[in-house]
Amino acid sequence: MDPNVKLDVDTSQVRQKEAGTYPIVYIAVDASGNRATANASLTVVKSAADEETVKKLAKEVIGQIITDDMSGYDKLYAIYYWVRGNIRYQDQPNLEDWLKAAYDGLKYHQGDCYVYCMTSRALLDAAGIKNMVIDTVPLRYIHFWNLVDIGEGWYHFDTTPRASGGTFLYMNDADIQEYSRNHQNSHIYDHDRFPGVQ
């Protein structure tokens, strides 16, 4: 028996972004060139975290917390405290699918800084507030938060609760950098990637 059998899986017919059942082939080849194959199928299911669902959930929340007569700052305040008050921190391994992260925050009310940030993104988008995602220069860990612009330039908007406390609602760059220096470089970011933060 060859302990170094090479195993490949042919998934060339799988369309990962389209729900369905697809054929796959396992191919094993030993050192002598003997080859064996086995056919199987792989089922791709539609994620509940699609863009339409996330937008719907975000609009439901916005409908409960935002009114037409609110100022831009009042809308930020309502979104900030909805996220802070409705999501509980729990480590999550997924840092790639923003829709899944936003869905987890809006539906299950738990997640890490990526979930807080992407839930905020979905709510800010639903409220018509200009925003972008910002992240730290990776040191010991990576942290995600938002930048927002309600007509006065870009400001920091970080809804993730911190053990040391703090409110990061419409925070200017000087203040967040001071906080960062005093808290293990929590918000060190590449200023060339995010120019013009107030």
Residue ranges and their predicted role:
Residues 115-179:
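Hydrophobic/aromatic-rich core segments of domains that either
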Residues 72-79, 109-124:
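Active-site nucleophilic cysteine motif
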Residues 51-105:
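Secondary-structure boundary elements
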Residues 170-198:
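Low-complexity, Gly/Ser/Thr/Pro-rich intrinsically disordered linker/tail segments
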Residues 2-41:
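Serine/threonine-rich, repeat-prone extracellular segments and beta-strand-based repeat modules
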Residues 42-50:
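Interdomain boundary/hinge segments at the C-termini of tandem beta-sandwich modules
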Residues 9-11, 49-53:
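N-terminal, intrinsically disordered, polar/charged segments of Gram-positive cell-envelope systems
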